[in-house]
Regions:
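Outer membrane beta-barrel translocator domains of Type V secretion systems
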Residues: 2-192
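Outer membrane beta-barrel transmembrane domains
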Residues: 175, 186, 195, 199-202, ...
Length: 225
């Protein structure tokens, strides 16, 4: 019935789903940092010539990022659309015994539009260390990254006589470790590199305290990994 439908909409608006959505999006976005670092290492090894990563002979490099993502809604939650753009820069050099070591930093911005007019923006500041070791055709790559987030959320709550515009500003962080092993198979007409990779990602915010109306939410620190 219409009453049941209105009740479902009210519960959805009260839930503060935008905070879970932005956390999910930032965890998913963590892959862009490690993909860039692994891509740079493959480039330095001579296994890839990525046009997205611009590098000089001294080991300095930069990559512009632009990505779009979405999550579909269902009977229990609304979906969202998100975009992330920014730049990563780094510097690496060859070391003794076929090692390569480097550091990287960068800035990205994530904008997310959720259900019922909710919106979240996050300014993301990245710092990472990475490296690889080659054993003939076998390459081992890995690194660690840390990202600081400054999150700004806005959401509307409208049902019955209730009409709120609730906002929040809070910080969060993402930590990640990643490793990859690849084996280069080079032939006269074909070059292949079968590989396997692993990643551990931990996200934690510093608590949420919305301001606005009676529907404003407060929450303690939350983390996911």
């Amino acid at each position: 019935s219409g009453t049941a439908g209105e009740a479902r909409q009210a519960f959805r608006q009260l839930s503060g789903q935008i905070h879970a959505d932005i956390a999910s999006a930032l965890v998913n976005d963590s892959r862009y940092l490690r993909e860039a670092l692994n891509g740079r290492l493959r480039q330095a090894e001579g296994l890839a010539s990525s046009s997205a990563i611009k590098a000089d002979e001294g080991g300095a490099w930069a990559q512009l990022l632009g990505a779009w993502d979405h999550a579909s809604g269902d009977a229990n939650a609304t979906g969202y659309q998100a975009s992330t753009y920014g730049v990563l820069v780094g510097l690496d050099s060859a070391a003794a015994d076929d090692w390569r070591l480097g550091v990287a930093t960068g800035y990205t911005r994530t904008s997310l539009h959720g259900g019922y007019g909710s919106k979240a923006d996050s300014d993301n500041y990245h710092l990472a260390a990475y490296g690889d070791k080659q054993f003939g055709a076998l390459a081992l790559r890995g690194g660690a990254g840390y990202t600081w987030h400054r999150i700004d959320t806005k959401r509307s709550v409208n049902y019955g006589m209730q009409s709120d515009r609730d906002t929040a500003k809070y910080s969060a962080r993402t930590e990640q470790l990643f490793a990859e092993a690849g084996y280069s198979v080079q032939g006269e007409w074909l070059n292949l590199e079968p590989f396997v990779n692993l990643a551990y990602v931990n996200f934690e915010n510093n608590g949420i305290a919305e301001s606005g109306g009676a529907a404003a939410l407060r929450g303690d620190k939350q983390h996911t990994d």
